[in-house]
């Protein structure tokens, strides 16, 4: 996808970039390392489609927005999208389990 400036997913599709596992800090200030090679289910939303279509033809707006940090279903089937020097994943909004707020 070299030369592409913007990618707009169709319908309920969401383009995400998975976030690598990092050490977590306890309330006491101790860092607990995580296995950086373990698969991560956290991702940043890069682009959002227009939403789902109801049976009557009207749209259901997407719940997530660009920039959200989300938890993805570990069994989600996604398409890998190489773009520039990064790899993104295209999945259905139904595969997002929740939005992570800090």
UniProtKB/Swiss-Prot annotation:
It is found in: Mitochondrion matrix. One of its GO terms (molecular function) is protein folding chaperone. GO terms for biological process: chaperone cofactor-dependent protein refolding; protein folding. Homohexamer. Keywords: Chaperone, Mitochondrion. GO terms for cellular component: mitochondrial matrix; mitochondrion. This is 10 kDa heat shock protein, mitochondrial. It holds the Pfam family Cpn10. InterPro entries: Chaperonin_GroES, Chaperonin_GroES_sf, GroES-like_sf. Belongs to the GroES chaperonin family. Eukaryotic CPN10 homolog which is essential for mitochondrial protein biogenesis, together with CPN60. Binds to CPN60 in the presence of Mg-ATP and suppresses the ATPase activity of the latter.
């Amino acid at each position: 996808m070299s030369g592409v400036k913007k990618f707009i997913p169709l319908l309920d599709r969401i383009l995400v970039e998975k976030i690598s596992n990092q050490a977590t800090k306890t309330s006491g200030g101790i860092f607990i390392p995580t296995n950086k090679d373990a698969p991560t289910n956290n991702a940043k939303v890069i682009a959002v489609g227009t939403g789902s279509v109801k049976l009557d033809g009207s749209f259901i707006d997407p719940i997530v927005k660009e920039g959200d940090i989300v938890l993805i279903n570990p069994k989600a089937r996604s398409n890998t999208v190489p773009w520039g020097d990064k790899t993104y994943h295209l999945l259905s909004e139904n595969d997002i389990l929740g939005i992570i707020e800090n």
